[in-house]
Each structure stands twice: as structure tokens, then as C-alpha cells.
UniProtKB/Swiss-Prot annotation:
This is Protein Turandot B. The keyword Secreted applies. It is found in: Secreted. The lineage of its organism: Eukaryota, Metazoa, Ecdysozoa, Arthropoda, Hexapoda. It comes from Drosophila yakuba. Belongs to the Turandot family.
Length: 139
């Protein structure tokens, strides 16, 4: 009985892992979405409003990143966001821009648009590297 239970747990763990993986189709869709976000975000307000969408895409791709890439981006993001805690626990969605409260000041807009530009470029670069490495012939 113990062996059967262990096998069932192992099978469930394997299925959950495979189902939650970041597929090539999801990567391609997110890559196209990031490119569209960057291309169509011309003014400061649009860039500020689309930061959350970039963060959502990053959160989807983060488990697939190399530890060094993930640590670098996590550090960059945490410097520009803060966790919203309720009774000491992060809410779903977890973070918000520090600058949102001051979004009307020119300095805050500069910080937010700089964050948007850097985050978007970092995510786009990761997608480019993923697709480049998957299309290069093996030696």
C-alpha cells in the first residue's frame, strides 16, 4: 500500500510539473505581446499603465529563467515596487508601483517610464535569447 501511495504522489507531482511548465507556445505569445506593448506604448501614461502587464508576463516566465537572470530582474523589480501586505501576507498580485502615488509629478513619470523601458528591454532580450538558442543547430 505504501508503494502504491508513493507512486500516485510521484505521478501527480510529475503531471502538475508538466502542466505548469512554460510552453514554447506561451513563450511565443508572450514574446509577441511584449513586442506589441513596447511598440505601441508611445506616451508616458501608456507606459505607466502597461507596467503591470509586463510584470505579469515576467511572473509567468520567471520560473523558467536561469537563477542569475531571475535574481537580477527580481532585484530590479523590487527596487521599483513594493509589496502590498494585508495582515502581514502579500495580496494576490502582490506588488504595486511605488511611484503610482506620485504619478502626476514629472520626476515620478520619468522614473516609471525608465522602469517600463528597462523592464521591457530585459524581458524582450530574454525572449530573443531563448528563441535564438532554440533555433541554432546543435554541434
Amino acid at each position: 500500500m505504501n508503494f502504491n501511495m508513493s507512486m500516485i504522489c510521484f505521478a501527480l507531482l510529475l503531471i502538475v510539473t508538466l502542466c505548469s511548465a512554460y510552453s514554447v507556445q506561451q513563450r511565443q505569445a508572450d514574446s509577441l505581446r511584449v513586442a506589441e506593448i513596447i511598440r505601441t506604448s508611445q506616451d508616458e501614461n501608456t507606459k505607466i499603465n502597461r507596467i503591470q502587464e509586463l510584470l505579469t508576463i515576467y511572473n509567468r516566465m520567471a520560473p523558467s529563467l536561469r537563477p542569475a537572470e531571475r535574481a537580477r530582474l527580481d532585484k530590479f523589480i523590487s527596487e521599483h515596487t513594493q509589496e502590498v501586505l494585508i495582515d502581514g501576507v502579500p495580496t494576490q498580485g502582490g506588488s504595486r508601483m511605488k511611484i503610482i502615488r506620485k504619478a502626476l509629478t514629472p520626476a515620478a513619470k520619468d522614473v516609471a517610464t525608465g522602469f517600463f523601458t528597462e523592464l521591457g528591454a530585459s524581458i524582450a532580450s530574454i525572449f530573443t535569447n531563448w528563441f535564438k538558442s532554440s533555433t541554432e543547430p546543435s554541434h
